[in-house]
């Protein structure tokens, strides 16, 4: 923090520091709108209020807990749980109250600018300080006494307002950059999904309708992963496959995992399909030999009937996923049984056409993955820039 700014406690800067209570403890019910808007820690984002799922309580709650009735401009900070220290300003005119997980910091407007305080409490330095002072009982929490005694650097009001103005402008530019990156990624995903569906809903000349059982099979048998010959083979479970992408994560050998129950052998010619929770769309093309969980189907494509790449994309298609989900729903269990899997019917082109279509899908998928990677990099860079700006602001360097 800047050495040139005086220090003040929040107890001296706020006319009220308090928190709410639980309606259930007070004998009140949650109600449908209209009622008293009831703010919980879920509604307090970082520098923004989140009301996609608002809650309401009986009007009489405000008579019982009048101390925590909100006013426009109140600084709200989360006192409990994973979002501890997350701070935003209540920017609505709705009559509202809060629960025990949210604290009110009602500033004296002639002493501290509420938006300056919100930015300060959301800064990396103060987030770290708040976490250092958590009291870990059943859930991490911060006390009102801690906030009353919390010392903050306090530049003159005009300087506070200037700093907020600079941060507002900078953060607006960052939000625009983030929105543009997200839009580019959404467009790429939409293009891939559109092309994927167009491939698997068309029926060209010479295409033949076939069941999955006509074009692939499960040829593997269960083996004991404790045997020496299998111990150093890589194991793939549903948790090791990324949804919709087919990427592998956190792979280990049978020895490293200490596997006991039976597993299927697979090789590089197969497609792995997770039969558990088909809506997750976990399908993969391994480029190695290994073992897979009994909750997966190692599918061997039939030569001259279907290519491995075409089978991979077919199992990721919307039509197959809907079919798989419907089958698991009828069975009353979130998994696809073998009989239902192989009964799936689809119009298939010749192998040459399959190779062409699968190649096009792979190219689009690679481009989508590239944009996904760029998006993640940009997100990380923007987050780092935000932290840097907040740090510079409260060091007096803006």
Where do the PLM segments sit?
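Short, conserved charged micro-motifs
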Residues: 111-115, 305-309, 355
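Short, surface-exposed loop/turn microsegments at beta-strand edges and helix-strand junctions
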Residues: 27-36, 48-57, 67-70, 88-100, ...
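Short, ligand-facing micro-motifs at secondary-structure edges
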Residues: 44-56, 75-99, 115, 119, ...
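A short glycine-rich beta-alpha junction/loop motif
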Residues: 3, 29, 79-80, 95-103, ...
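Sequence-specific dsDNA recognition surfaces
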Residues: 11-27, 42-72, 213-225, 236-268
């Amino acid at each position: 923090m800047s050495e040139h700014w005086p220090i003040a406690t929040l107890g001296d800067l706020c006319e009220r520091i308090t928190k709410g209570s639980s309606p259930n403890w007070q004998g009140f019910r949650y109600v449908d709108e209209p009622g008293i808007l009831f703010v919980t820690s879920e509604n307090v984002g970082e520098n923004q209020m989140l009301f996609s799922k608002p809650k309401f309580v009986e009007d009489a709650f405000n008579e019982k807990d009048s101390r925590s009735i909100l006013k426009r401009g109140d600084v709200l900070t989360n006192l409990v749980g994973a979002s501890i220290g997350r701070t935003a300003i209540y920017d609505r005119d709705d009559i509202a109250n809060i629960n025990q997980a949210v604290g009110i910091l009602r500033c004296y407007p002639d002493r501290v600018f509420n938006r300056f305080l919100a930015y300060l409490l959301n800064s990396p330095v103060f987030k770290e300080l708040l976490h250092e002072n958590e009291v870990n009982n059943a859930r991490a929490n911060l006390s009102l006494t801690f906030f009353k005694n919390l010392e903050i650097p306090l530049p003159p009001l005009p300087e506070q307002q200037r700093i907020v103005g600079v941060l507002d402008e900078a953060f607006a530019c960052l939000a625009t950059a983030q929105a543009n990156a997200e839009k580019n990624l959404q467009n790429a995903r939409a293009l891939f999904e559109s092309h994927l569906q167009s491939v698997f809903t068309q029926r060209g000349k010479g295409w033949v309708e076939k069941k999955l059982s006509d074009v692939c099979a499960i040829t593997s048998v269960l083996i004991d992963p404790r045997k020496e010959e299998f111990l150093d083979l890589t194991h793939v479970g549903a948790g090791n496959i990324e949804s919709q992408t087919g990427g592998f994560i956190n792979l280990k050998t049978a020895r490293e995992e200490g596997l006991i129950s039976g597993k299927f052998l697979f090789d590089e010619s197969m497609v792995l399909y997770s039969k558990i929770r088909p809506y997750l769309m976990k399908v993969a093309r391994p480029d190695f030999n290994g073992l897979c969980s009994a909750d997966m189907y190692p599918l061997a494509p039939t030569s001259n009937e279907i290519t491995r790449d075409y089978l991979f994309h077919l199992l990721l298609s919307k039509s197959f996923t809907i079919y798989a989900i419907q089958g698991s729903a009828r069975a009353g269990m979130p998994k696809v049984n073998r009989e239902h899997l192989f009964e799936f019917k689809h119009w298939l082109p010749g192998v040459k056409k399959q190779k062409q279509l699968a190649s096009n899908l792979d190219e689009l998928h690679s481009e989508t993955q590239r944009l996904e990677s760029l998006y993640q990099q940009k997100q990380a860079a923007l987050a780092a820039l935000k932290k840097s700006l907040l740090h510079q602001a409260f060091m007096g360097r803006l």
